[in-house]
Amino acid sequence: MKYTIIPFLLLVALTCATARSIDGSEKEVQEIREETPSSNEDVPFSLSANEDEEARGRLQAFLAKMKEIAAQTLGREESLSANEDEEARGRMQEFIKKLKAYLRKMKEKFSQISGREESFSANEDEEERGRLQAFLAKMKAIAAQTLGREESISANEDEETRGRLQAFLAKMKEIAAQTLGREESLSAIEDEEARGRLQAFLAKMKEIAAQTLGREESLSANEDEEARGRLQAFLAKTKEIAAQTLGREESLSANEDEEARGRLQAFLAKMKEIAAQTLGR
């Protein structure tokens, strides 16, 4: 009997100790729950002064980096030093040169195609010419605004411009020879119509030459007379070639004429699209 009571007392003591331990654990859990808000409750987020200052600093650094990237993308700093300003001007002049070269290529293609058969009405032809002139005027205005100055060309630049004019006239002569270098057999009415188109073509070439140079020619009396003489000689030579060529056989089939007209319309549509994209319309 004595040995039976001892284990019983030990069991009771163990049970009491376990109960106390469980009660203590429950109290600790309750305290933790009281200190920790529920996940379903909205907890306001408030930064300390140091954390707020750190976040503000990171934001300012981010904005400064964005400003730097924007300046690099635009190709200039907001306030340029002398060297940086010169570099930006050089990049702009290079862009203008590329733009002029692109326009010259477009004009050459237009000149080559305009030498073929056309069946545009007077209104459509005038409308296309007006759009082209407006586009060229817009390009000239953009170039003038971008450079921000009137062109004052030195002797070397003037010589370079004169060389470009001579190359342009040589190219026009080559195009005229290639265009007119085919057999023609025109009636009196068709011959008059072709002569009218040729005169319009020569007038257009003269206009394009003036627009290509992008400025009024201010040559000395001798240079002006020399340039005028070369232009008159070119026109006389072109008329002579035209007269010789118009006296020969030409027989284009209806399909070839339709094909040429289709290519011309496609080219004009492409020019209209490029002009619309450039002008931002």
From Swiss-Prot:
Modified residues (Serine amide): S114
Domain of life: Eukaryota
pH dependence, entry free text: Optimum pH is <8.
Keywords in alphabetical order: Amidation, Antibiotic, Antimicrobial, Repeat, Secreted, Signal
Thermal properties: Retains its effectiveness even after exposure to 100 degrees Celsius.
Name under which the protein is recorded: LC-AMP precursor 3
Modified residues (Leucine amide): L74, L147, L180, L213, L246, L279
Tissue specificity as recorded in UniProt: Expressed by the venom gland.
